[in-house]
Regions:
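N-terminal strand-loop-strand
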Residues: 65-104, 131, 135
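General structural signal for alpha-helix termini and helix-helix connectors
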Residues: 28-32, 70, 142
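Acidic, metal-coordinating catalytic segment for phosphate/diphosphate chemistry
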Residues: 36-82
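Nudix hydrolase/Nudix homology domain
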Residues: 2-44, 48, 101, 171-194
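Unchanged
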Residues: 109-133, 141-194
């Protein structure tokens, strides 16, 4: 099974593509395993996937195995939602505490979330503004160069209207601001802007 041909090859290092695929096959295999032999083999493949990633990154192999073992059921990409919020022609950005970079407010959609509701919640939590998601303006494969993600994800960007609130930071954000196209900060968050 090939992943999206040549474009996929340009975005991810082969070792990460292989490790993700091994992890996903193993996770799904564990879900459907019928005996302890199958469970042992799929568990070993999870360890191999973690080994591959830990050799090529600063991530700990044992922690990766634990993270992978916490994933249950059929493996699918994760959903990350982002809010494109404008005021007087300026885009709302938040500064990440994790890496000090700027990004549109947002985060992982929770199980059971409608994506538009998830982005409304995330903008309120991270920036202090109550918004209404109007429409999807972009869906992006989060596989990019830069800091690598262990799991595959898609980003859904919503155009949002402000209903109320005021700028407020959170435990994940250290600054909130609106920026014109010419004033977008140079240091964009590698964590969530890709």
């Amino acid at each position: 099974m090939k992943n999206n041909g040549e474009q996929q090859d340009l975005l991810l290092p082969k070792w990460l593509e292989w490790a993700r695929e091994i992890q996903a096959i193993s996770q799904t295999g564990l879900h459907f395993a019928e005996n302890h032999y199958q469970r042992e083999r799929f568990s070993r493949l999870i360890e191999i996937a973690a080994d591959i990633i830990s050799v090529h990154s600063d991530l700990d192999q044992a922690e990766l195995v634990e993270i992978f073992n916490d994933q249950i059921g059929y493996a699918t990409p994760r959903i990350d939602v982002r809010g494109a919020v404008f005021q007087n022609g300026k885009l709302l950005l938040v500064r990440e505490r994790a890496d000090g970079g700027w990004t549109m407010p947002g985060g992982w959609a929770d199980v059971g979330d409608v994506p538009s509701t998830a982005v409304e919640r995330e903008v309120l939590e991270e920036a202090g503004f109550e918004v209404s998601a109007q429409r999807v303006i972009g869906v992006y494969d989060a596989n990019r160069t830069g800091p690598l993600e262990v799991f595959h994800a898609f980003k859904i960007v919503f155009l949002c209207d402000i209903l109320g609130g005021e700028p407020r930071t959170s435990n994940e954000t250290s600054q909130v601001g609106f920026f014109s196209r010419d004033d977008i900060p140079e240091f964009l968050s590698g964590e969530r802007t890709r």
